Each structure stands twice: as structure tokens, then as C-alpha cells.
């Protein structure tokens, strides 16, 4: 056999071996993929009483809008309204079709506090806003929130997740400024929260737990 013939046979053997390997790989993938799918389908997240309210909100669609800044908190109202109005206009739906949660955490946490608290502690709650407002800026429909407000959101059935860790940080500032204990200040915050408020262990934690209850997650900037 000539050198040319030897090279031809060698190439054929190589291609044959590669073909066998590829088929074996595809067969392995065909076997492994259903196994992985079954593993994923079999996952059931642990349930906790603190999160039960997420599963109790009525609606055929679930959305969790997260925010962590003053601007993001205002836009969260805008986005919640846009979703609901678009659903009504384009899908012939209604606001009650949505289990909608807006999260105020970190820099937007004080939006979860009612007007009486803002009137009492404007410099603390309005930190970063000049001049410091004496009522919750989200109590009024304005350009920042797309002409929506806390009350208009509540009328549409929207609920609010308020970060407890951020609220406790603010309570510590109130305690330092007024001489009450941090626990007393935090209790006042909880009592003076906006309607439909749920104080969650941490806003970031609530955002992850909401997804375990099949909420779509949107971050508002």
C-alpha cells in the first residue's frame, strides 16, 4: 500500500472514531438532560410563615418591583401603574388581576412611612432631599412618580414590602436624636407605616423569596 493510501485509510479511521464519539456524546446528553430536568422540577423551596403573605395575595399575575434609591422608589410606582394600565388597555384586564408588590429598601425605605412620621422627623426621613419634605413625597402624584401616589397604588391593590433592616437603621437615628430607645422608635415606625405595608426581614431577602412564590422580578432605578 502506498503512503497516499495509508494516509487515506488513517483519515477514514479518524473520522469514524470521531463520529462514534459524537454519537456517544449525544446519547449521553439525551440521557442526562431529562435527569437534570427532573431534578429541577422536583425542587420545592422551604416555606416560612414570615413569607406567607406573598402567597396569599390574589391575582393571576405576580410582580415584585424592587427599589433601593429615592429615584428608584418613585419610579417603582410609575412602573407598577404602567404594568396595570397596559394590562387593562391592551389585554382587557383589570387591576385585580395582579398580585403587585413594590419594595422600599435601603435608600427608598422611608417611602414606606406615613405622613405623620415625615412631619415629625423630616430631617431624618428626608435625608438626601433638599429641602426636607414634611410629608411622604410619594403621598402626592407628581412628575417623579409618573403622576401616581401611594393612595392610587393602594386603590389598584398594590402592596408594599418595607425593609425591616433599613427601618431599624432609621429608628436608631430617631432614637439618637430624640432620646427614646431604638425599639420604641421602630415600634412608632411600624405603627405609622403606609397602607398595605408588610415589614420584611430584609428587602433583598423578600426579593428572592418572592421569586420562590412565582413573582416576576423587576428592579426600579
Please name every model-derived segment.
Residues 133-221:
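A cross-taxonomic marker for long C-terminal extensions/tails that follow the last structured domain
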Amino acid at each position: 500500500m502506498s503512503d497516499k493510501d495509508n494516509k487515506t485509510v488513517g483519515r477514514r479511521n479518524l473520522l469514524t472514531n470521531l463520529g462514534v464519539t459524537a454519537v456517544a456524546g449525544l446519547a449521553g446528553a439525551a440521557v442526562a438532560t431529562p435527569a437534570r430536568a427532573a431534578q429541577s422540577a422536583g425542587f420545592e423551596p422551604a416555606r416560612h410563615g414570615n413569607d406567607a403573605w406573598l402567597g396569599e395575595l390574589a391575582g393571576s399575575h405576580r410582580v415584585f418591583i424592587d427599589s433601593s434609591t429615592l429615584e428608584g422608589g418613585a419610579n417603582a410606582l410609575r412602573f407598577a401603574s404602567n404594568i396595570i394600565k397596559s394590562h387593562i388597555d391592551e389585554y382587557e384586564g383589570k387591576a385585580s388581576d395582579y398580585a403587585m408588590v413594590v419594595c422600599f429598601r435601603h435608600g427608598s425605605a422611608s417611602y414606606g412611612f406615613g405622613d405623620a412620621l415625615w412631619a415629625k422627623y423630616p430631617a431624618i426621613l428626608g435625608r438626601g432631599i433638599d429641602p426636607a419634605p414634611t410629608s411622604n413625597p410619594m403621598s402626592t402624584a407628581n412628575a417623579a412618580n409618573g403622576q401616581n401616589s401611594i393612595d392610587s397604588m393602594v386603590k389598584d391593590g398594590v402592596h408594599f414590602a418595607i425593609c425591616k433592616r433599613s427601618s431599624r437603621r432609621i429608628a436608631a437615628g430617631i432614637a439618637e436624636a430624640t432620646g427614646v430607645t431604638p425599639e420604641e422608635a421602630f415600634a412608632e415606625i411600624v405603627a405609622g407605616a403606609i397602607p398595605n405595608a408588610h415589614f420584611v426581614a430584609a428587602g433583598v431577602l423578600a426579593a428572592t423569596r418572592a421569586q420562590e412564590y412565582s413573582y416576576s422580578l423587576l428592579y426600579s432605578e
